[in-house]
A protein has these predicted regions:
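Bilobed periplasmic-binding protein-like "clamshell/Venus-flytrap" ligand-binding domains
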Residues: 2-3, 50-64, 202-213
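Short, solvent-exposed loop/beta-turn-alpha elements that line the ligand-binding surface or hinge
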Residues: 30-34, 57-59, 80-99, 147-152, ...
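Short helix-initiation/N-cap motifs at beta->coil->alpha
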Residues: 35-40, 113-127
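Glycine-centered hinge/linker elements that transmit conformational signals in sensory
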Residues: 42-49, 85-118, 163
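Conserved C-terminal helix/tail region of periplasmic/extracytoplasmic solute-binding proteins
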Residues: 205, 219, 224, 237-283
Length: 283
């Protein structure tokens, strides 16, 4: 099957900037580019931990929900990748990824938590239990269910960040949303679906409103800058320039997602990182 794309976004992470400033760690953050170095990230975690915040961040691994966040933090820290460039194999067992997983495991304030997935992490970040979230995007930044958009439940500032890197060139995971048609053998219904999709996703007078309704960004440059004048969306658009490889097309993707959180659980339970990632790749 094929997808007719409509909109996309870049997944990122977020920090409680109020708490980061409180412990003097905002010096490690480039607030204009929303970037930081791996060393700066680790120093920020350390400052928060020593400042009295025992639970700074979580490597959540109860399931696949939000797994793009744990992949991105691990791949970005030391220049690792999730697959090879040709999308023929998975590379979790690279030296760069092993170093990142081991570093996260050994860092005080970061916990491998098999009881939560991405959605749970967001809740814990919003309620102040965690001071960082690895499962984040513009939909979360704009969420106003429990307070104004961009604030935690207690009113602290939420600041979106690219994942930390040694190189200064973050590679973010992207999400692409669109439409598909199932071939049920009824040509009339298939044609009607085509007409509907063409209207929603390609009609010059409609597509802008369709993308706006998604709260994401257009996949086609022809749609133009639909968020001109919107300070939050314009600022967040900086993350689109950090989009990395769309490796979800690699064969065995469904199995890889399951094996990923299983691997993180094993590391959290004390298994050697080298052993855990070898099992991931072998499976």
């Amino acid at each position: 099957y094929y997808e007719y794309p409509l909109c996309m976004t870049a997944h990122c992470m977020a920090v409680n900037m109020t708490k980061v400033k409180e412990v003097g760690a905002d010096q490690y953050i480039d607030t204009d580019k929303h970037t930081w170095s791996t060393d700066g990230f680790l120093k920020t975690v350390d400052a928060l931990y020593n400042g009295g915040y025992e639970n700074v961040a979580a490597i959540y691994c109860a399931g696949q929900g939000g797994d793009q966040g744990t992949r991105a933090i691990i791949n970005n820290m030391y220049g690792g990748t999730f697959t090879d460039a040709a999308h023929t194999k998975y590379t979790a067992d690279s030296a760069e990824n092993i170093k990142a997983i081991q570093t996260l495991h050994d860092t005080k304030g970061i916990n491998f938590d098999a009881s939560i997935a991405g959605g749970d992490e967001i809740t814990l970040f919003r309620n102040g239990t965690l001071q960082m979230a690895f499962c984040w995007n513009i939909a979360q930044q704009a969420n106003s269910d429990n307070n104004d958009a961009g604030l935690t439940n207690d009113g602290d500032e939420i600041f979106p960040m690219a994942f930390p890197t040694d190189s200064g060139d973050p590679k973010l995971c992207g999400g692409i949303w669109g439409f598909g048609i199932f071939d049920n053998g009824d040509e009339a219904k298939i044609e009607a679906a085509r007409t509907f999709i063409d209207f929603i996703a390609a009609d010059p007078d409609q597509v802008k409103d369709s993308v706006l309704a998604s709260t994401y960004f257009p996949v086609r440059t022809s749609v133009g800058d639909i968020y001109a004048g919107n300070e939050v969306m314009s600022e967040y658009s900086k993350f689109m320039g950090y989009l990395g490889d769309y490796y979800q097309i690699t064969p065995g993707w469904t199995t890889a997602r399951t094996e990923w959180w299983n691997m993180l659980q094993r590391v959290g339970s004390g298994e050697a990182v080298e052993t855990a990632v070898k099992t991931f790749v072998d499976n």
